[in-house]
Curated annotation (Swiss-Prot):
Example GO molecular function: oxaloacetate decarboxylase activity
EC number: 7.2.4.2
Name of the encoding gene: oadG
Signal peptide: none
Phylogenetic placement of the source organism: Bacteria, Pseudomonadati, Pseudomonadota, Gammaproteobacteria, Enterobacterales
Top EC class for this record: translocase
Membrane topology per record: Single-pass membrane protein
Assembly description: Heterotrimer of an alpha, a beta and a gamma subunit.
Protein name: Probable oxaloacetate decarboxylase gamma chain
Length: 82
């Protein structure tokens, strides 16, 4: 065998291998998609319940309820670090 024949066989083998890999990957993609369709058909996502209306939040300038919470947090922090 001369160099041209070896090079030709090398290219043939390379393209044959790449073709097998491409075919396998295409089959793998089809299998994954078909499994996804089957799973979604037999086990559909549960319908989400409507969320209850959000409660109205306290106004931003209402610090009368936050002052005792902040004072308690500061007291707790100082007690732990002393």
């Amino acid at each position: 065998m001369n160099a041209a024949q070896l090079l030709g066989e090398g290219f043939t083998l390379m393209f044959l291998g790449m073709g097998f890999v491409l075919g396998f990957l295409c089959l793998l993609i089809l299998a994954i998609k078909s499994m996804s369709v089957a799973v979604n058909r037999f086990f559909p996502e549960p319908v989400a319940a409507p969320k209850p209306a959000a409660t109205t939040a306290a106004p931003a300038d209402d610090f009368s309820r936050l002052k005792p919470v902040i004072a308690a947090a500061i007291h707790h922090h100082r007690r732990l670090n002393s």
